[in-house]
Structure formats: structure tokens, C-alpha cells
Curated annotation (Swiss-Prot):
Disulfide bonds: none
Alphabetized CDD domains for the sequence: M20_DapE_proteobac
Example GO biological process: diaminopimelate biosynthetic process
Protein name stated in the entry: Succinyl-diaminopimelate desuccinylase
Cofactor names: Zn(2+); Co(2+)
The encoding gene: dapE
PANTHER family, A to Z: ACETYLORNITHINE DEACETYLASE, N-ACETYL-L-CITRULLINE DEACETYLASE
Species annotation: Burkholderia mallei (strain ATCC 23344)
Amino acid sequence: MSATLALTEQLIARASVTPDDQHCQQLMIERLAALGFECETIASHGVTNFWAVKRGTAGRAGKLLAFAGHTDVVPTGPLEQWRSPPFVPTHRDGKLYGRGAADMKTSLAGFVVAAEEFVAAHPQHRGSIGFLITSDEEGPATDGTVKVVEALAARGERLDYCIVGEPTSTATLGDVVKNGRRGSMSGELVVKGVQGHIAYPHLAKNPIHLLAPALAELAAEQWDEGNEYFPPTTWQVSNLRAGTGATNVIPGHADLLFNFRFSTASTVEGLQARVHAILDRHGLDYTLNWSVSGLPFLTPRGELSNALDAAIRAETGVSPELSTTGGTSDGRFIARICPQVIEFGPPNASIHKIDEHIDVRFVDPLKNVYRRVLEQLIA
């Protein structure tokens, strides 16, 4: 059994449902410390994080490439639906089954073994290697990567390159890498009316009727046209609530929850201003609370994307596509202290599902891609 596969199995066997790390990080830290990494645990409100760095011969003057990822996994769902226990690594039909196999314990194992092989082959490597690992990516993500980034920023630590081990591939290993993600912003809108008897509408104000024209305009609005890297910004309603449950009462308020997924072609302030303008134009009496869970980030083609492209081609023969689709990731936090952030990992078809798995034939090639990038950028 390869070193990467063995470590993957060890990590899967630890039931690290978010935010409980179950000592996955300690297992990684022990391996990294043996290589000479300086390892620091940064805990916050029950979340376990660590930052590890091995300086190269150039010290802080050299480039720093960090691997970022998460040890936490999503809950298993109904255990009886799994063909094998989710935290017992199981081989079947050339695949390794277990919660976290694809998202993202194989990537974590690949990071560690790639670093081990690289340091053994290049003991005098010029650049530095970092690890930024959290147990709070699948949860609220309020005490995980963002806390490590804040700590690193406070001490003036800057990363030059970062590979996030998210499962970005689709049909085969290496066909898709993510060089950015859209931002996410939600709004909680309450439109005020006047409750009353449904037979006497002149004595009430129906907030649903008042909201409807504005809602139609918001849904039809073209927020931007996107750009070379991002599709157009989208606005979607997630929840609409009103009424008492009775059929003869006009409600006193209507509550609307909505979300923007926005590109670098729009700004938080610009989108908020346009929403308020539409609501004001329709004369609504309302309150609106905003929450921004992530800003968009983008890594244009450059040293990291070129190195990853070359490594994937050499290892798999696949020509990767750069993409910014999908939801948010911890890359949005890391981009604050790192100009080049790219996500790359195994196929994602089974992530978060019953019988999550990875094709065993992809395990070592994934590790080899990570090692090749180290060799190209910091050897």
C-alpha cells in the first residue's frame, strides 16, 4: 500500500464530523514536525486549526507555498444506507469508501506525503512550505481558516502561493481546477403592512401585495454581465414567509430571504444600493439586514496556475480547465494574504453523499501533482 493511501485510510478512520477534529491534525503535525516544520495550533471556540511552516534556505526572502484544507467532514446521514461503515475505510471495486475520502482526506494525505518526498529529494530547498489546516470548513467557518489568516496577517506573514485541496475534478482527476470563487451575500427583508380582516382590505395593508411588484423587478434585474472569468451575478429567493395560517387574515408583514452570488464585476456596496433603490421606488416600508459570507476572489493565470497546469498534464495527460463555478470555499479568506490561490483535488461526484469514495488509481497521481508543483516553484 502506498504511503498516501495508508495515510488517507488513517484519516478516514477518525470520525471528524465538523468541528470535531478527532486528532486528525495531530497525526499530520507529527509527520510534519519530523520533517522540521514549526507547527502551531490555533484553537478557537471548539475549533482546531494549525499553521505549520518549514523555511527554505532563502528564509523569508524566498517564496512560500502553502497547502490549505480541512480535516472536518459532513455528517454521515442514515448509517443503514451505507454499504460499509462510513468511518471504516473499505476497498471495493477499485475504490476507497468512507466519509471524507473525496472531501478532503485524500488531499490532506497527498499534501503530507508530497512534502515528505519533496524534502527528502530537496533538503536544501530555497522556498518555504506551509500548511494551513482547519476543522471548521464544513460548518459555520467562523473559527477556522479565517482565524488563522487573521493571526498570520497580524504578524505580517504573507503567502505567495496557496493550493486548497478541495475536490475540484469532475469526470477525471485534473480536468478542472478552481482559480476563483464568486462572492456570497444574503439579505433578510421584512416588508411591513397592516394586519386586518381579509373581507375588509381597505382597513389593512397587505404586505404580500405591496412586495410583489418589487419582487418581480428584483427577479428580472440584470445585475451585471459577468466577465472573462465569472458568469453574471445571480439573485435568488431562498425563503418567503407571510400569514398567520388563517385564511381570513391579511398578514402584518412579509419576510423574504434572498442571496446574491456575485462576480468581480459587482461590488457589495453597488448591489446593496441597487436593491434599496428598487424597494424605495416601490414605496415599501421595510427593514433589510445584510450579511456577507464571502467576497469574490480571482487568481489570473500566473506562476501557480502555470505550474499546476504543467504538473497535471505531466502526471495525468489531462488538460485542466480553469473554473470559478460552485459555492464558496476557504479560499476567500486565504486570498486576503495570498495573491495566488488555486483549488485542486480529486473528483467530486460523491462528496457529501452516502458511500462517498475515491478511485484508488487517483490517490498517488494527486500526491504527485502536489509534489511537482513544489518542485517547480520552491526547489
